[in-house]
């Protein structure tokens, strides 16, 4: 049985990280179901144009929510350090300050995307025939930004104190509800892409509001008292350092992907549809190592706060080996079953779309160990209060990816050049991150 709450400062290292990571993995699995359900229903029942529109919308939404996710992850890292060092009062103060800060940013972000939607679609070079579909989908899906903030904020708070089970439970209910509502809204009510978007937004509010109310009732140690509701400049500076830098790292990562999406869109509907389906499979495939990296980050943060550097070093060795094993297995599975996986989302008769997606998956899939290492590096530098290093690694990875994608796609390689740019970017960032770590040790 997986315990509800972990102290990662004692006990078996690998076992504890894995036990903490498992609910994160299941939770991310369910999170992926939101978009996979949309992709499957839209791709199978509404056609390639609708799939291309929803796929491009997903890339945009991932960028926007990454800003909030980074802020929530950063505030969670601050809380985790204070939890590890036993600073309960300061921890509650961090909850008060970070909640108001991120809630305000979420409201501003929501307003900006509504006002600038037409300009955003133009920048993404969305084909004219898809603009109406994308606009219909996005105008509804943007309503879920507040729900995304609520869920990610409270989920990261609970994970900071070692509880990864409760976020999983709320996400499970929400994901199942989303699948049911997707089928009802698209197949029964015939609401098209608007129905798929509405199903997702409603389900997001179920998980966001639900986990917020549950946390406030069941975890009093995280609920600010009246005396905690004040602005402490030093504590706020620490929260801002971790939150803003983590948000910058997350948003740079997804802005780079957004730029690549714009390039992909220029190749037409076939490549857009292939990319939309393949990215879902790709994200799903490396999800275990991403969540393992987040679990490792909490492990490092708690031990960093508790002043246990030797235990951190042992955890690095253990996490590196475990992540490598994950990646090898996942790489073999994706490369072997790329075509059947594409067939989940695309009608087998659309062979051109499937062929493009298979090529993408086999190039990326063969190199998953690169992103596995990168997720560990992101988690480590965030946990030891060096989020700026995570930003540098992200710029190296995504900068390389975007630059090479535009350069190589203009050669006879064409769209293959876009696919090849990804693992090259991972490798460069890994080399920088490992080199910096080794230099600091000497």
What are the residue ranges of the model-derived segments?
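N-terminal transmembrane alpha-helices
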Residues: 8-45, 59-74, 78, 103-110, ...
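Short alpha-helical transmembrane segments in multi-pass integral membrane proteins
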Residues: 1-21, 79-144, 188-244, 300-367, ...
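Small-residue hotspots at the loop-to-helix junctions and early N-terminal turns
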Residues: 48-59, 138, 197, 269-284, ...
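Helix-terminus/linker motif at the lipid-water interface of multi-pass membrane proteins
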Residues: 29, 33-52, 121-128, 184-191, ...
């Amino acid at each position: 049985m997986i315990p509800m709450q972990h102290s990662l400062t004692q006990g078996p290292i690998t076992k504890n990280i894995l036990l903490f990571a498992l609910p994160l993995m299941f939770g991310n699995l369910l999170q992926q179901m939101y978009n996979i359900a949309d992709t499957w229903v839209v791709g199978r029942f509404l056609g390639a144009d609708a799939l291309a529109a929803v796929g491009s919308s997903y890339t945009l939404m991932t960028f926007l929510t990454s800003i909030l996710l980074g802020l929530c992850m950063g505030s969670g890292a601050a809380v985790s350090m204070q939890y590890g060092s036993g600073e309960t009062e300061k921890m509650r103060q961090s909850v008060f300050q970070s909640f108001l800060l991120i809630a305000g940013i979420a409201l501003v972000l929501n307003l900006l995307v509504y006002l600038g939607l037409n300009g955003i679609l133009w920048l993404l070079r969305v084909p004219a025939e898809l603009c109406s579909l994308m606009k219909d989908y996005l105008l509804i899906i943007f309503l879920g930004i507040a729900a995304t903030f609520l869920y990610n904020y409270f989920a990261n708070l609970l994970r900071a104190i070692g509880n990864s089970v409760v976020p999983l439970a709320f996400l499970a209910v929400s994901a199942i509800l989303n699948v049911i509502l997707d089928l009802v809204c698209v197949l029964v009510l015939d609401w098209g892409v608007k129905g798929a978007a509405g199903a997702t937004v409603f389900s997001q509010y179920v998980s966001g509001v639900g986990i917020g109310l549950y946390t406030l009732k069941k975890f009093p140690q995280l609920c600010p008292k009246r005396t905690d509701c004040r602005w402490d400049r030093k504590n706020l500076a620490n929260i801002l350092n971790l939150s803003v830098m983590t948000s910058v790292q997350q948003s740079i990562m997804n802005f780079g992907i957004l730029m690549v999406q714009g390039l992909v869109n220029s190749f037409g509907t076939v490549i857009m549809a292939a990319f939309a389906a393949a990215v879902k499979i790709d994200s799903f495939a490396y999800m275990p190592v991403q969540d393992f990296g987040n679990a490792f980050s909490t492990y490092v943060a708690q031990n960093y706060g508790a002043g246990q550097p030797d235990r951190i070093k042992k955890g690095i060795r253990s996490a590196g080996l475990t992540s490598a094993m994950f990646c090898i297995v996942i790489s073999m599975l994706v490369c072997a079953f790329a075509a059947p996986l594409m067939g989940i989302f695309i009608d087998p008769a659309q062979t051109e779309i499937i062929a493009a997606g298979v090529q993408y998956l086999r190039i990326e899939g063969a190199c998953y160990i690169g992103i596995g290492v990168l997720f560990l590096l992101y988690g480590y530098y965030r946990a030891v209060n060096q989020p700026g290093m995570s930003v540098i690694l992200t710029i190296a990875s995504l900068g390389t990816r975007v630059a090479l994608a535009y350069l190589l796609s203009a050669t006879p390689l064409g769209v293959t050049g876009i696919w090849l740019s990804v693992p090259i970017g991972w490798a460069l960032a890994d080399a920088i991150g490992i080199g910096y770590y080794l230099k600091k040790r000497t």
